[in-house]
Amino acid sequence: MKPDMTVNLAGLELRNPVMTASGTFGYGREFADYVDLEKIGAFVTKGLSLKPRPGNPTPRIVETPGGMLNAIGLQNVGIEAFIAEKVPFLARVNTPAIVNFFGSTPEEYAELAGRLDEIPQVAGLEVNISCPNVKQGGIVFGTDPACAGQVVAACRRATKKPLIVKLSPNVTDVVVMAQACADAGADALSLINTLTGMAIDLKSRKPVLANITGGLSGPAIKPVALRMVWQVSRAVQVPLIGIGGITSATDALEFILAGASAVQVGTASFITPSASQEIAQGMERWLEEHGVARVSDLVGALEC
């Protein structure tokens, strides 16, 4: 008998625990020719803002040992174009679409959450708190528990949809941040976002990225991500989504053991567009081969 791969994630019924990560899968349609969307649990759109954003100047992507740095700058079409141009595709897909979004003030976050709450094709929301708070001198929401709590509480009041908060690893104590977000009303937490890094061109003596710094993703960050998922899983009661360097079914299952109920596949999709589907299928094979009846039986089953 085939293992049960289904997951209930904060009210979202997923056919399996594999999702795609924001910023690596467009709005879903871009990858539909390469991935059978009905073979993955859910997909997460690239980050959305109230107004369109052109993003950062180039170069804004560079390969690094074991990963990549990106400084895309949250380029996106804005909420109006998203509703007019992207939502019709979501209506044709039988897989939950989760919209990642961000703002520069708690009020902007709340306004976006309210607008997205009105769209039936949007199954859930993922809040990107790795953005500067323009009202408080540019401090990044996701590095201050009070600021993060304000954003999450504002979004919680604006929507009844499942609310996932994406945590930054660029903090002193990720557990404190996780607790603040959970206490403010997050239904689930996804972690980790990218680590801040940079690359230098020795010949020109200049940064490779026009933005100087960028977000590091890929296999290089997996050990950090695993550690943070494990730490947070021991401290909060809400379900977790593990992110960071997942390129195989084995990687994904390690995150499940560490305490994640689901995972997101990001950078791997740039290398192999069908990576998320292949990882989901590989997880099912592993469970079958090892006599595990339900993937949920492995959540937090790490033996320490």
UniProtKB/Swiss-Prot annotation:
InterPro entries: Aldolase_TIM, DHO_dehydrogenase, DHOD_1B, Dihydroorotate_DH_1, Dihydroorotate_DH_1_2, Dihydroorotate_DH_cat, Dihydroorotate_DH_CS, Dihydroorotate_DH_I. It comes from the Bacteria. It is found in: Cytoplasm. SUPFAM superfamilies: FMN-linked oxidoreductases. The keyword Transcription does not apply. Keywords: Cytoplasm, Flavoprotein, FMN, NAD, Oxidoreductase, Pyrimidine biosynthesis. Binds 1 FMN per subunit. It is an enzyme of class 1 (oxidoreductase). Substrate binds at K46, N70, A71, I72, G73, L74, N128, N193, T194. One of its GO terms (molecular function) is dihydroorotate dehydrogenase (NAD+) activity. The active site is at C131 (nucleophile). FMN binds at S22, K46, G47, N100, N128, K166, I192, G218, G244, G245, G266, T267. Its cofactor is FMN. Gene3D superfamilies: Aldolase class I. One of its GO terms (biological process) is 'de novo' pyrimidine nucleobase biosynthetic process. One of its GO terms (cellular component) is cytoplasm. Coiled coil: none annotated. Its EC number is 1.3.1.14. Pathway: Pyrimidine metabolism; UMP biosynthesis via de novo pathway; orotate from (S)-dihydroorotate (NAD(+) route): step 1/1. Catalyzes the conversion of dihydroorotate to orotate with NAD(+) as electron acceptor. Heterotetramer of 2 PyrK and 2 PyrD type B subunits. PANTHER family: DIHYDROOROTATE DEHYDROGENASE (FUMARATE), DIHYDROOROTATE DEHYDROGENASE (QUINONE), MITOCHONDRIAL-RELATED. This is Dihydroorotate dehydrogenase B (NAD(+)), catalytic subunit. The lineage of its organism: Bacteria, Pseudomonadati, Thermodesulfobacteriota, Desulfuromonadia, Desulfuromonadales.
